[in-house]
Amino acid sequence: MPVPPSASSGAQTETDTAALADAAAYVLRTVPEPQCGSVGGEWAVLGLARSGYGDAAWSEAYYDNLVAYAQAQDGVLHARKYTEYARVVLALTAIGKDPRDVGGYDLLAPLGDFERVTFQGLNGAVFALLALDAGGYAVPAAPAGRTQATREGYLAEILAYQTPAGGFSLDADGGDADADITAMALCALAPYSGDAGVSDAARAAFLWLSDAQGANGDFGSAESNAQVLIALATYGIPPEDAHFVKDGRSAFDALLAYVVPGGGYCHASADAEANPMASEQALLALTAVTRQRAGESGLYAMTGDAGTPHLNLDAADGANKEQ
């Protein structure tokens, strides 16, 4: 079981720098041949590219493998899970590749089909909006006879999954809110937080996350801590914000408690071995926090004019404005 570190400070520290370097080195070492996929693929590519630890030859190998896969599949990454396309768009945007021409296939185009994208519910809308906004892409035209997607439509779909308590649920009919999807929904909402209704929804979601945080600052797994840290950084909120420190410990401290020998991260505190997904999500979180501390754009904000929304968690409803 990993040993929890002491509480971190609000400024960039040697511990932060070393943690990011170790996480990046671990991913490079354990993913020698990146492929199209949620593990050993796009999240690793995104994390390494946005952290500054990316390797050009490694990224090119991913792209070549993706081209070969897309051509072998006739451009169909998945018949029903359109999050596959959104995830690929995020990775390609991060390494400077055009998702609209991957071996002759337009992998952005499926995000124009609102029905197919939202077949996966909240996940579909969140991933699609993140992907579209990451590169400032125009929403593709939907196929004939299908419902045309719009940014406004995806935004409304996401907000429909917010519970009265403020968190987001995977169940549109009022199921329990979940920290991971709440954090991801917050990232998708960020570019629209200049709207009073969106900023109020985001504030409510962050306050729900604050209440959901454990008494020791932990959200229950490496991946959950990572997602919350990414959401905080996206809004320019440091991990040490008073709303997210419990018993002197932040989610950043909690995440570092999941490090195992060798530089990887385990999924649960009782685990002794590194978990690939947890390690890649930790890399993303450490990248996001490092960028936030340096005053850089958020993890998913990859256009040149991308700013950082700033949210006052203590403001009254309607008082938040994007800065």
Whereabouts are the PLM-identified features?
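Preference for long, amphipathic alpha-helical scaffolds in soluble/luminal domains
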Residues: 1-323
